[in-house]
Amino acid sequence: MASFLSFLLGEKKKTASIAKERLQIILAHERNGRNACEPDYLPALQRELVAVISKYVKINPEHLTVHLERQDDLEVLEVKIELPDSVR
């Protein structure tokens, strides 16, 4: 009965699980080779990361970079965030 009510009322997903699902989709697209040198989603991913991090720490959006690097069969998604001195 509880699962039926959850289905009807809609159960909210946690932010972490949503982010995990998004990253899995992004990685799946990358592995299929659908995107060229730099994927179209990187700017959107960067904007979303700035929005989420800004909820907890005030950062300059220019101090967050997202970079995808490919080496042979390895893909590395690198995210660099420069935190203000008051947080460190």
UniProtKB/Swiss-Prot annotation:
**Which terms under GO biological process does the entry name?**
cell division; regulation of division septum assembly
InterPro entries noted in UniProt: MinE, MinE_sf
| Keywords in alphabetical order | Cell cycle, Cell division
Record's function text: Prevents the cell division inhibition by proteins MinC and MinD at internal division sites while permitting inhibition at polar sites. This ensures cell division at the proper site by restricting the formation of a division septum at the midpoint of the long axis of the cell.
* Family per similarity comment: Belongs to the MinE family.
- What NCBIfam families has UniProt attached to this entry? minE (TIGR01215), PRK00296.1 (NF001422), PRK13989.1 (NF010595)
Against HAMAP family, the record matches this protein to: MinE
Protein name listed in UniProt: Cell division topological specificity factor
Q: What is the lineage of its organism?
A: Bacteria, Pseudomonadati, Pseudomonadota, Betaproteobacteria, Burkholderiales
**What's the encoding gene here?**
minE
